[in-house]
């Protein structure tokens, strides 16, 4: 019987690495993805050169600017990142069909028994890293172990641009000297609480009596106790199809501008309906989400009379929901989001309304153009107005 081997693959500083791949002039420079520092926002990603100044994800952009005035600040290009992510996952799927994506830039691979195909699992990891670098122009780090949790921690030890394999049976000794902060699931508050008790390494965590650990951490204690020894029986799971699609955006400044809000809502609606049609689905439910300047958040949803997948149908429904909220509360809006759910397959119809048929053809044409040239290559009149509003 083969010894279980799990691989965790993580693209190093993903957003920034993609930007450096397409813009070589950014190589070896402190680059920060997140937007202009004078705008409200946080660091989405920082290059390793920027991290040397203490900059990290989630930090306010203005703070990052103070720490590293010479840093290059750029807007994120999420369409580009998704394209790179798709290519990344395709590369991984060439090595194992048992693939579990974890966001855009990392994934688990079940590689038990694959040694005969590649010489060894370590050689397999080297091949994966070489292909990623050759085809995407970015680096990856890989951890290999007998479980998902140990593999992920091994990846962190391998960064940047390296690989780390934990020999079978040596998981506990590998993890024992590491700081408890490296354990997935231990947040800042839990870390501080444990360290206040003198528990600062995974070895000390693993040695705690189960009853004591449960009194500290509650029902999460058994998992952490096992994980600290590298014991984690969770399988690598193929992703199931998402049951909803949503998009939201936080504005740089709070706004009451109705024209701007409608244009942004139209853009968000076009994004989610394009994804819906790409899946060959229709939706029965449309939801709107609005967060006001005082952080009050309201949501509304509507069940459609007939399943739909068209830009116009989804947008008009979302617009009606948005206006229903704004008519009763005219505070400035901080965040706007739209979502769809309760999917079904396309309905077969013997007769189609000519006007609806024309709109479906228009949506299909827009989809083809955008798939080839990018989402922003063609825009509707309403979303085009956004160009003049920044």
Curated annotation (Swiss-Prot):
Mg(2+) binds at residues 10, 105. PROSITE patterns: UMUC. Belongs to the DNA polymerase type-Y family. Its cofactor is Mg(2+). It comes from Dehalococcoides mccartyi (strain ATCC BAA-2100 / JCM 16839 / KCTC 5957 / BAV1). The record marks 15 as: Substrate discrimination. GO terms for cellular component: cytosol. Binds 2 magnesium ions per subunit. This is DNA polymerase IV. GO terms for molecular function: damaged DNA binding; DNA-directed DNA polymerase activity; magnesium ion binding. The gene is dinB. Keywords: Cytoplasm, DNA damage, DNA repair, DNA replication, DNA-binding, DNA-directed DNA polymerase, Magnesium, Metal-binding, Mutator protein, Nucleotidyltransferase, Transferase. Pfam families: IMS, IMS_C, IMS_HHH. The lineage of its organism: Bacteria, Bacillati, Chloroflexota, Dehalococcoidia, Dehalococcoidales. Its EC number is 2.7.7.7.
């Amino acid at each position: 019987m083969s010894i279980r081997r799990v691989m965790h693959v993580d693209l190093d500083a993903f957003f920034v690495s993609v930007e450096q791949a397409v813009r070589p002039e950014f190589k070896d420079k402190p680059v920060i993805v997140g937007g202009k520092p004078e705008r409200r926002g946080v660091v989405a990603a920082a290059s390793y050169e920027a991290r040397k100044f203490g900059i990290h994800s989630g930090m306010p952009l203005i703070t990052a600017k103070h720490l590293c005035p010479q840093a290059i600040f750029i807007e994120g290009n999420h369409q580009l990142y998704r394209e790179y992510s798709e290519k990344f996952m395709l590369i991984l799927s060439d090595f194992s069909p048992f693939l579990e994506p974890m966001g855009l830039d990392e994934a688990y691979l079940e590689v038990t028994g694959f040694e005969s195909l590649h010489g060894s699992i370590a050689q397999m990891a080297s091949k994966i890293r070489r292909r990623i670098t050759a085809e995407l122009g970015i680096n990856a780090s890989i951890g290999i172990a007998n479980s998902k949790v140990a593999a992920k921690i091994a990846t962190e030890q391998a960064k940047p641009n390296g690989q780390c394999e934990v020999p079978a049976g040596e998981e506990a000794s590998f993890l024992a000297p590491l700081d408890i902060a490296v354990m997935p699931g231990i947040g800042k508050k839990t870390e501080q609480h444990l360290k206040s008790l003198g528990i600062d390494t995974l070895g000390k965590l693993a040695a705690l009596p189960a009853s004591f650990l449960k009194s500290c951490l509650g029902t999460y204690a058994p998992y952490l106790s096992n994980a600290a020894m590298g014991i984690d029986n969770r399988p690598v799971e193929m992703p199931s199809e998402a049951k909803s699609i949503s998009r939201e955006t936080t504005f740089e400044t709070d706004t009451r501008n109705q024209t701007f809000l409608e244009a942004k809502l139209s853009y968000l609606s076009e994004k989610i309906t394009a994804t819906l049609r790409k899946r060959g689905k229709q939706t029965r439910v449309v939801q709107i989400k609005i967060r006001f300047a005082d952080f009050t958040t309201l949501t509304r949803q509507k069940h459609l009379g007939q399943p739909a997948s068209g830009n116009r149908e989804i947008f008009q429904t979302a617009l009606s929901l948005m206006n229903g909220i704004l008519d009763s509360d005219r505070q400035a809006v901080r965040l706007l989001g739209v979502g769809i759910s309760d999917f079904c397959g396309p309905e077969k119809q013997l007769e189609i309304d000519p006007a609806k048929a024309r709109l479906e053809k228009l949506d299909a044409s827009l989809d083809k153009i955008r798939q080839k040239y990018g989402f922003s290559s063609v825009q509707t009149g309403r979303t085009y107005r956004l160009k003049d509003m920044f």
